[in-house]
Every structure is written in C-alpha cells, then in structure tokens.
Amino acid sequence: LGDVYKRQICNIPHPSYKEEKISNYLVDFAKERKLEYYQDSLNNVIIIKEASKGYEDAAPIILQGHMDMVCEKTPDCDKNMDEDGLDLEVNGDFISAKGTTLGGDDGIAVAYALAILDDDSIAHPRLEFVCTVSEEVGMEGASSIDVSMLKGKKLLNMDSEEEGIMLASCAGGCSSRVTLK
C-alpha cells in the first residue's frame, strides 16, 4: 500500500477541479488489469472487479473515496501544487510531505482501493470502486456521478478522520436555501 500511495498517487497533482491526471491514472490502472471501468466528463471513475471464484452469488460491495486533495503549503515552499507531485519524507512507517499537505484525505482511500483491486489472492464478492472528484469543494463529483451500473447495496466510505478507526457511517453535506420575508 505504501508503495502505491508514495510512488504513484503522490507523484500526480490532484487538487480540486484539476483531477484529470489522477482520473486517467485510475483508468489506466483498470485497463492494465482488464477491469471494467467508467469515466465521466467530470473525471469521476468507477472500477469494477468481478467476484472471485466461489463468491459469485455474494452481495457486491461498493468501495468509495475521492481523488481530490486539499492543497496547502508553507509560506517558504515554492512548489506549484497544480503542476508538481509531492516531495515525500519517509520515517519508518510514517509518510509526510515536505512543505505541503500530504493528500491523505482522501489519497489513502484511493491507495487502499487500488491495493485491494490489484490483489488476486483476496477472496471477494464483486467489488465496485467509486472515486469522485471535487469532494473538498462541495461534493460536486458525488452529486452528479451516474451510478446506474452499480449492483452493490452496501457502501464502505473510506474517508475517515482518524487513523485506525472504522467509521460505521460517513460524513455528509446538506445545503439549504432560505428566503426571509
């Protein structure tokens, strides 16, 4: 997992509204493994891996994350977050970025999903990875993605706030328009 995240995802700039490169990386990942995939005009991606032998009748599982990251940097950092990959520091099991945010929200979900989809030794039902764009700026990708091809009824949102904590729900958003007279 660390290798996928460290070497590939962090090398691809993926701020909100500029997810095309990471989206295309996900499509290439699916193509290389002969997995079914969908990419829409906003660059949302769905990757489907059919069930392994013996799990064909098991209920499909939807894995969900988002591909954009919050791009912040220290005042002395001259990195162009729209164009440059991250400079990583690895200290044992810990990965951090030099002078910038790491993009762990939600790069870790993307890395986990890719590691799961890439591992043929894991027995599994049909897996459906839904990876949306522009979550950090209002869940825009999630609001407009066509999920009609999904068969799963259970979704595992992998965008949690704390390491080592499994969340039995997910963050949500709501907007209202109020007119006062």
Q: What does each of the following model-derived ranges do?
A:
Residues K6-D93:
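Acidic/His- and Gly-rich active-site-bordering loop/insert found
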Residues Q8, Y25, Y112-A115, S144, ...:
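Alpha-helical scaffold segments in soluble metabolic enzymes
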